[in-house]
């Protein structure tokens, strides 16, 4: 099964997450199929908090990929940002 989930990066006490497509059997920071965007929970000022290729997310969901709960919330946030822009 394929999932769209977060993989952690960044420094200690300063997390940064990539939103990726991966097989559920892969480790959290292991092999991925495609990188769809990123999530910066500590963004400040004009830095974007979520950058996500919603067209590719729709493609993967159409092919049977499942989103984790956090990625589903980020996807909604990215779609609302795109609609507002």
Curated annotation (Swiss-Prot):
Superkingdom to which the source organism belongs: Bacteria
Ribosomal protein in keyword set: yes
Keywords, comma-separated and alphabetical: Ribonucleoprotein, Ribosomal protein
Record bears the keyword Ribonucleoprotein: yes
GO cellular component: cytoplasm; small ribosomal subunit
Pfam families listed in its UniProt record: Ribosomal_S16 (PF00886)
Cited PROSITE patterns: RIBOSOMAL_S16
One MF term in the entry's GO annotations: structural constituent of ribosome
GO terms classed as biological process: translation
Family, as annotated: Belongs to the bacterial ribosomal protein bS16 family.
Protein name, entry field: Small ribosomal subunit protein bS16
């Amino acid at each position: 099964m394929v999932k769209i989930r977060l993989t952690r990066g960044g420094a200690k006490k300063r997390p940064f997450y990539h939103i990726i497509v991966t097989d559920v059997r892969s480790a959290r920071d292991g092999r991925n199929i495609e990188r769809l965007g990123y999530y910066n929970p500590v963004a400040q000022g004009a830095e974007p908090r979520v950058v996500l290729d919603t067209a590719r997310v729709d493609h993967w969901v159409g092919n049977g990929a499942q989103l984790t709960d956090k990625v589903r919330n980020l996807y909604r946030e990215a779609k609302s940002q795109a609609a507002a822009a």
